[in-house]
Amino acid sequence: MASIVEGPLSKWTNVMKGWQYRWFVLDYNAGLLSYYTSKDKMMRGSRRGCVRLRGAVIGIDDEDDSTFTITVDQKTFHFQARDADEREKWIHALEETILRHTLQLQGLDSGFIPSVQDFDKKLTEADAYLQILIEQLKLFDDKLQNCKDDEQRKKVETLKDTTNSMVESIKHCIVLLQIAKDQSNAEQHADGIISTINPVDAIYQPSPLEPVISTMPSQTALPPEPAQLCKSEQRPSSLPVGPVLATLGHHQTPTPNSTGSGNSPPSSSLTPPSHVNLSPNTVPEFSYSSSEDEFYDADEFHQSGSSPKRLIDSSGSASVLTHSSSGNSLKRPDTTESLNSSMSNGTSDADLFDSHDDRDDDGEAGSVEEHKSVIMHLLSQVRLGMDLTKVVLPTFILERRSLLEMYADFFAHPDLFVSISDQKDPRDRMVQVVKWYLSAFHAGRRGSVAKKPYNPILGEIFQCHWTLPNDTEENAELVSEGPVPWVSKNSVTFVAEQVSHHPPISAFYAECFNKKIQFNAHIWTKSKFLGMSIGVHNIGQGCVSCLEYDEHYILTFPNGYGRSILTVPWVELGGECNINCSKTGYSANIVFHTKPFYGGKKHRITAEIFSPNDKKSFCSIEGEWNGIMYAKYATGENTVFVDTKKLPIIKKKVRKLEDQNEYESRSLWKDVTFNLKIRDIDAATEAKHRLEERQRAEARERKEKEIQWETRLFHEDGECWVYDEPLLKRLGAVKH
């Protein structure tokens, strides 16, 4: 990594309301990104502004491969590179700089200045761990003797060779560090200097002939026991890097002092670039611009009342979960329960223990602010674009329900869903499908603070039902072979199952027997770290089937984004989705628009509905998916299409905990949910950990016994997951 990186970028300015060319200089040692109106102005030292990188967070847009943001000092600066490769180079250099100075920030904020004695203590610890590793290495010989086949033996031998190489590297590092310590002691005693590692808070300017040790930080893995990080009083430190110059930009001419590489050690002939006029002594207290014309999202921090500052602790546990293979592993729910028993124990979201599902969790905004340091720790462990599937997440950010239960909220307006089959004309049915689809997302996000639902366990089940308005279930005929066998045939029933853990795939099914309509879907959630945001790609599809008309409407799902993760997180949807009916030829294109940083509204959608073989839509829709959407027809008619503010949410009904099977969502997660409800984060984390450990043990047992996992209610059909006993199949059996 070069200590000075420079090149052109465009920066958004509010004065011009657009992008303006600037020449940027990144000083790795100072932790400072300075910019100038031109390269000539840079050589004359006429700095336009600067961005302080200590404690900064980089963000990217998942739908734009050239722009990125830097959030620091309660401001968000927006930049644009020439292309994706250019952006990647800048982001890599910025991440390395931020990581270095964030680590320094920990030590400075704690008032701890590491001494040679601390360094020596760490060396002793490293040597002790090395001896343990060497002892463990001997176990490979026993493992090799027990190998049953050549393939297994080859894997163990490869692992042994890799471990041997790692041991030798560690030995070499310890020896070099010991030599460096001895040399440092000798030099400092000769000069009468107290033996301490100097904290780097100002711009480091070594002499041209000064030998420098490069300790460029690299990405670190999440610790297996994050709680230990809170207890440790030792803080990492790093030594400054020697002067090396690199220039970003394909059309720029390298300067005479450029080396083109940051990995090789600097030679004694290298000198700091003379044409870079940086502040001679200190890094500015805050990021600034001479005209303060940056575009920044100040209101993001205004909502929370503070800005990101400290990194002091960590909590959480891994989310690698598997299936419970206990005695309750029934293939289907018990269908012998009486209606009176089941319904007397039925509960809506507003009752007792489950009341948390229907209230806005506004009061929990404080918990996000309270645990901001944990989020900062997470940010320091991940890279932009990194898959978050296996990343440890702190317990406090969890929402008190499973992802499977969240999918049930697609049917918070079951009356709109069943009314699809009431339409007599295929055009009206397509319009009604779109209406139900656009109403399906807002109910899942009723709180003002976005949180993450539990990752479902392999084999986890969630089932519920809805009673339609103006309908009564008294003396009603039961749908005994349906997914929820204790409810009436006029209800909408729902069941979901986690059918795969790697990759994480959820399958869910809903139906209304009397209306002869069903819905089958599967979603593979793939999360990605975007800096100030987290993106979740919902890969998969759903199918609405109107059995009376033999019509099947195939639809896709938008992606989700968790924004402002350092302040008050909020959710938005983004991406283009489609709905198609192959039998009738009707189709719809729906676009969920993410909020652009240079203006615009949140939560916008636009949609077009097309007749068969028509390139021009007969209905255009626009508005907000969590607000009001308006429709404009080709006839000139304008009307409110969906008003989610006025649509009553019909509460789902779920059996009480004592009547649920062990593998049902609320039963599985009851201890975690209860402790989150009373805000006992430690107890919630412990409950989550116990659940995970049990599942891991059962997964190992299946592997040792070579037992394949069998799903409960769904099966794989090509690239889709299909419910075993859909209404279509059951009605077909009755006809025959």
From Swiss-Prot:
The keyword Cell wall biogenesis/degradation does not apply. It is found in: Late endosome membrane; Golgi apparatus, trans-Golgi network membrane. The modification Phosphoserine is found at residues 306, 324-326, 329, 611. Pfam families: Oxysterol_BP, PH. GO terms for biological process: lipid transport. InterPro entries: OSBP_sf, Oxysterol-bd, Oxysterol-bd_CS, PH-like_dom_sf, PH_domain. Residues 253-274 have a biased composition (Low complexity). One of its GO terms (molecular function) is lipid binding. Residues 2-99 form the PH domain. The modification N-acetylalanine is found at residue 2. Its main location: membrane. It catalyses: a 1,2-diacyl-sn-glycero-3-phospho-(1D-myo-inositol 4-phosphate)(out) + a 1,2-diacyl-sn-glycero-3-phospho-L-serine(in) = a 1,2-diacyl-sn-glycero-3-phospho-(1D-myo-inositol 4-phosphate)(in) + a 1,2-diacyl-sn-glycero-3-phospho-L-serine(out). Residues 314-329, 336-348 have a biased composition (Polar residues). GO terms for cellular component: Golgi apparatus; late endosome membrane. Keywords: Acetylation, Endosome, Golgi apparatus, Lipid transport, Lipid-binding, Membrane, Phosphoprotein, Transport. Residues 209-368 are annotated as: Disordered. Belongs to the OSBP family. Interacts with OSBPL11 to function as lipid transfer proteins. Together they form a heterodimer that localizes at the ER-trans-Golgi membrane contact sites, and exchanges phosphatidylserine (1,2-diacyl-sn-glycero-3-phospho-L-serine, PS) for phosphatidylinositol-4-phosphate (1,2-diacyl-sn-glycero-3-phospho-(1D-myo-inositol 4-phosphate), PI(4)P) between the two organelles, a step that is critical for sphingomyelin synthesis in the Golgi complex. PANTHER family: OXYSTEROL-BINDING PROTEIN-RELATED, OXYSTEROL-BINDING PROTEIN-RELATED PROTEIN 9. Heterodimer with OSBPL11. Interacts with OSBPL10. This is Oxysterol-binding protein-related protein 9. The gene is Osbpl9.
